[in-house]
Structure formats: structure tokens, C-alpha cells
Amino acid sequence: MFNIVLVHPQIPQNTGSIGRMCVNADCSLHIVKPTMFEISDKTVKRAGLDYWHLLDVHVYENLEEFLTIHHDKVERFFFATTKTKKPYFEASFQAGDFLFFGGESTGLPMDLMQLKWDNAITIPMGKNGRSLNQATSAGVILYDAIRQNFSAFEMV
């Protein structure tokens, strides 16, 4: 239904949790290297529990490879970032959209987000907050996208 894109993820447990969520939400997971861990790392699979073998996962050597393959879908790229004021719930998501999340300590590259800056979105936080955990952020935004497209969501 949707595509989660992790650009340079750093924490294997987050990637594993997001992978598990993708299986449960009928989404594809795209991982853009470099990563700070091996995709086959046991901590990734442990966090993904027994779902990992069910995951539709695509791994790219770098951002250039990802963009070469998906260049025709830029209009449907959405970028989770703290660098915008536009809340995620003002976005209009469609099945097939790509939801991007950056590395836990680095975020997304600005040049990537500038491909479609109008689709940069944020999760509102209180004055003392800086950012949410990557897996939490992915869940918040993904499930709002599903809510907006619930009639197309196939539940078990």
C-alpha cells in the first residue's frame, strides 16, 4: 500500500521494528545505504521478530541508485523532517506514496528534500521536544496515511 524509505539508518532495532510494522501494514521497506549495521544483523531480525521473512524489502547501495530507479515517482515522495512547520496531517497521502525517514542522528539530506520540498512534513512536538524515535515517527505518519486511505486497506 505504501513505501517506507529509510535513508542511512543507524539503529538496527529501529529498522527491525519498522520492518515488522511494514509487514503488518502491507507496506514495502526501502533501505538506502550506507547503514551503521548489516541488514542481516541479528538485532534487526530480533526486533522484526518472525516477520522478517515476510517483509517486502529493497536495499539500495546509495541514494543515487534509489533515485535512478524511482525518479518517476518524485511527486509522491514525502519527507519526515524537523526542518519544516507543515504538520503531517495536512498532507494528502495516496496508496503507493513513498514516506522517507532519515538517519536517527542526521535526518534526511536537504538536497533530497528539495526534490519536492512541498512534501516535507513534520510531527508537531511540545516546546521541550526535539524529535521522536525513528520507528515511532514512521508509525505515526504511516498510520495516518492508512487512515486517509482506509477503504483500500485490506485487514485480516
Show which residues each predicted segment covers.
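Post-transcriptional modification and biogenesis factors for structured RNAs
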Residues: 1-156
